[in-house]
Structure formats: C-alpha cells, structure tokens
Amino acid sequence: MSPQTETKASVGFKAGVKEYKLTYYTPEYETKDTDILAAFRVTPQPGVPPEEAGAAVAAESSTGTWTTVWTDGLTSLDRYKGRCYHIEPVPGEADQYICYVAYPLDLFEEGSVTNMFTSIVGNVFGFKALRALRLEDLRIPVAYVKTFQGPPHGIQVERDKLNKYGRPLLGCTIKPKLGLSAKNYGRACYECLRGGLDFTKDDENVNSQPFMRWRDRFLFCAEAIYKSQAETGEIKGHYLNATAGTCEEMMKRAVFARELGVPIIMHDYLTGGFTANTSLAHYCRDNGLLLHIHRAMHAVIDRQKNHGIHFRVLAKALRMSGGDHIHSGTVVGKLEGEREITLGFVDLLRDDFIEKDRSRGIYFTQDWVSLPGVIPVASGGIHVWHMPALTEIFGDDSVLQFGGGTLGHPWGNAPGAVANRVALEACVKARNEGRDLAQEGNEIIREACKWSPELAAACEVWKEIVFNFAAVDVLDK
C-alpha cells in the first residue's frame, strides 16, 4: 500500500482537516473478489479535482467524515475504508467522471439490501463538493449474493406452477385504477381472464381506500380467478397488492391471499421499502405464493442521467431482496427506456452470469451463483401493434401487460383479451417458423386479423397510436 494512503494511527492523532484523496484515492489498489464494486457518475463542483471528488464519495460512503477524529486510532481504517481505485472521464461531457469505488465486504450486514444502500447511497448524495452524483452500477460479490434468498420462486418454478411454456405471459392492469367498487373490479378481472389473459393486476396505488377495501377486493378477485379457471381450463392469477402502511398489515393481507388459495400477490417495493419487501419475499417462498413487484417511484430516483441511481442497480437490489416479476419498461410504449439499456438490466434480472458490456450499460461482470431469476414485465402504453416488437425484444420469459390495450377495446374487456392472446400466439408461431418479427411484424398481425374479428377491431382503434419521444437516459457515446 502506498505510504501516502495508508492510515497510520500509530504516529498519533493530529487534529484538523485533510484532503480526502490522501487517504481514499488509491489508484494502485487491486480489487478483491469479495469487494462490492460501485461505478459512480460524479459531477464535481467547479475547482474540485476529480480525484478529490471520487475520494470524497469513497470516504463519505464508508469510514470517512469531514475532519480527522481521534477514534480513527481505535480501529484499522485500511481494512474498512472504501477506496476510489479508478477514474475515467465521461465521453462528450467536460465535467463528468466515472469513479470506481471498492468497499470491503465487512462493511455490510448479511442479507440486508437496506444496509447496503444506507452505506453506499446514504449521506454522500447531498455532499456539497459534488454538483451531482449517480450510482451507475454495482458488482455484488458471490460471497454477499449467497447471504440472500432472492426471488421467492424464480422463472422455472413459476412456469411449472402455471403449466405455461414456450411463450410470454399476458397480463392486464385494471382501469380505471381508482374508483371502482370491489364487485365491478372483480368483474373486470373475470372478463379479462376468461378472454385469454394469464394475469390481471392491481394498479400500484390500489391498496385499501374507502371506495374499495382490500378484503372485499381480494374476495371478488379470487372469485374471478376460480370462475375463469373453470371456464378456460388454464391457471389464472391476479396480482393482489399487499402493500400497506405497516409491515404487520402487509403480512395480514398476504396471509389472507394465501388462505384464498390464489397463486400470486404484489408489492410496491420502493415505496414499501426493502425491509418490508424482503420479509414479504421470505413469506411467499415459505407459503407457495408468487410475488409480483411494481417499481412505483423509480423514475424519481433513476430518470435523470447525472443524479440518482440507475435502474439496473435497483433491479439488482430487487433480485437480492426478492420478487418473481418486476416492471422493466417496454422500449416501445409510453414510458422511458432505451433498448440497449433495457436489455442490459433485463439480462441482469433473468440470467445467471452476465459479462461486463459497456455498450449495454453493464459496468461489471455479475455472477448470481444460481440465485433465482426475475421475470421482466413490459407495461405502459402498449397495444396489439406492439406485440411483434415486444415478443422479439423480451422473449419468452417475460410478462407483456396491456392495461388500456385490453380494456380500451371497443367491444369490451373479454374481446380485448382475445385480441391480445391472438396477436401473441400469431407472433410466437411466426417466430417459431423462422420469420423476422422486427421486419414482418405488421404483416403477421394483419394476417392474424383475417381470422380474429376481435384483433381486427383492436388494430383499427390503435393503428395510429405512437409515443415518439427521445429517451432522457441514454448510453454515453
């Protein structure tokens, strides 16, 4: 270790303020397999060198503070401190740098996403020496991954539970999201499920409001599930949102869902919190419930390119905390999401081993050592004309979720569900025959319209609906 960066408590305590880079900028450091590695996009204040800014991030997110303290001598800072070990300028940005920081594993409580984030993205984001700060990616070491249960069941177990293979799953968010009575809500679910969807969904802000209390909703949705299963011979589900004001109330709702015998429940993991989410994921594994995760509030955290936390980090955190599905954007719909960035974190959700690939925004190689995978959910402003692109982009291990794209059908919910199911089956059949969905997608849908009046009506309604807005968060060139 460089004499400049070694913490020498033995020479005695010397009060005062010293530059962070003297202790926390260590370009000669060789990272360990057990280190948690972080890539930060740092925008220093004018006059602050990048080395000082990177070192400040490492210090303030580990053992450092603004001044020397005598209690430094009571421990080994060299063992516990974070280290900024590499800095690179961001192409095309005069004042932005990617600063790489290594954290020793001993800094983190086992199995706690809450503790990991409290350390890495805690006070440092308000640090005055930085104009902006964004956590772009984390490398979670194998030793830390193994302290997490992860998703309650994972992709293969879900397929086996549902007995559905070889195609994406279809879902629908019930609209209007607020204001329906429980009985009318259940009726809407039933119509969608009997029409051919695999799932219906509570919207993220449906909890237990005066117009529809949670217990009533659970009962009517369970009735819809069982009735549609009896009619279609397929296993159906509804994402019953168990999110609540307290963990105790959340668990009470999860227990009631299990007693009803439904296959899946739901949680808003960012607004509900990682501690609550991990507890719920453990309960779901122990009791055979699938867990659908909504990412409400994510864009507050991840949308701005130079400040916040990138969604690929939030996706990794969810895989550790636990969830069988998570919303991932659509690339083609109404919500933010560049194709290569989206496919990068979709791989981080589903695959077991993901190589570093900066062209898709992946800063580190990640080994999940067989932690179960998470199914990405494409949802937001999509309709039947998007089906070929969605099937091509997301593949079989995904949920394609059409809210307005089902309920907005001119003939009603069930025909809307039929249209989506026919479009999906046509795309899967064409893909399996070797046709190019990206090039022939519209033709495939038009061919299917000839033998499905429901699909033809849907195509007519949404033939001119597009969302042509550039993504805010794009890859560095």
UniProtKB/Swiss-Prot annotation:
Binding site for substrate: N123, T173, K177, R295, H327, S379
UniProt PTM comment: The disulfide bond which can form in the large chain dimeric partners within the hexadecamer appears to be associated with oxidative stress and protein turnover.
Positions bearing N-acetylproline: P3
Location relative to the cell: Plastid, Chloroplast
Catalytic reaction equation(s): 2 (2R)-3-phosphoglycerate + 2 H(+) = D-ribulose 1,5-bisphosphate + CO2 + H2O; D-ribulose 1,5-bisphosphate + O2 = 2-phosphoglycolate + (2R)-3-phosphoglycerate + 2 H(+)
BP terms from Gene Ontology: photorespiration; reductive pentose-phosphate cycle
Residues binding Mg(2+), per UniProt: K201, D203, E204
Reported cofactor(s): Mg(2+)
Cofactor: binding details: Binds 1 Mg(2+) ion per subunit.
GO cellular component term of the entry, any: chloroplast
Chief location bin: plastid
Job description of the protein: RuBisCO catalyzes two reactions: the carboxylation of D-ribulose 1,5-bisphosphate, the primary event in carbon dioxide fixation, as well as the oxidative fragmentation of the pentose substrate in the photorespiration process. Both reactions occur simultaneously and in competition at the same active site.
NCBIfam families named among the record's database cross-references: PRK04208.1
The protein's name in its UniProt record: Ribulose bisphosphate carboxylase large chain
Taxonomic placement: Eukaryota, Viridiplantae, Streptophyta, Embryophyta, Tracheophyta
